[in-house]
Each structure stands twice: as C-alpha cells, then as structure tokens.
C-alpha cells in the first residue's frame, strides 16, 4: 500500500485546474472516480443491492462536496451527472441534490468513506489514489477554494500515521500552496 499525501494531491489538482476548462476538469474528475468504483464493484459482485449501496455512497460524497460551501456550482453538478450516467444511475435533479444535502450528516459521510476505504488494501494503489484525487478535483471545481468542511471529509480517506494529511485545518492552510 502506497502512502498518500494530501498536500501533493491538492497541489496536483490545483495545477490541473489551471490548465483545463471546466468541462475538461469535470471529465477528469469523473474519469478518476470510475477506476476505483469499477474495481470495488468487481470485489462486491454484481448484486444490485451492493451496487446501489456503492453508488449511493459515492453520491453522498459528490453531494456533500457540491453543497458544503453553500454555493451551487454547475461544474461540480456536471461532474456528478457524468459519473452517475457512467455508473448507469439517473442523477438527482438540482432540487433533489439540495434535499439530500439537508439530510446528510457528518456521521453518514464518515461511514460512507469508511466503507470505501475498507477496500483500500484490495484495490490497486493507483486507483485508490485516483479516487481521492477525484474528490480533491471536485472540491476545487468551479471555485478557487477548498473549504474546511471538504478538508475534514477528504482527510477521512487517509490512514493516520501512514499517509500524510495535516492534523487540522489551520495546519493544512499553512502547508498548502
């Protein structure tokens, strides 16, 4: 298992953000997600209940990152829609995204990430890293910031003591950029 470094991933996401237009960036975000999603889907089997749980888990993360900064950004929504269609699920409408966001709790999101992270040792390191990078991309899509809520959720993908992720928001802000 290869250690992850949040600062390195965020620097890469920021650098790529400045080189691409919004459509290219949302496409890249979706592509990064699909590799890990497909491999996890192979592990859990093609049982509709398991597939649905996996999709809903990813959907929760997309919705949280889309809405956590209290702004609706079309690019983030476009990336979510592309991913949903790729996964063969109907994307939520904007109003449904807003309603789901109101129901999400931090505990739900931590459970969702724990579920995904439980597959880390069973999928290719590069695919897990690509998945985390996809959510870094998504958090920067359409805006110029990475907010505290996004930081605390994304850091749940990191294993404390093995991966590098600053311990708190203030340390992260000092180290990034």
Label the model's feature ranges.
Residues 1-67, 71-177:
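Small-residue-enriched hydrophobic alpha-helices in membranes
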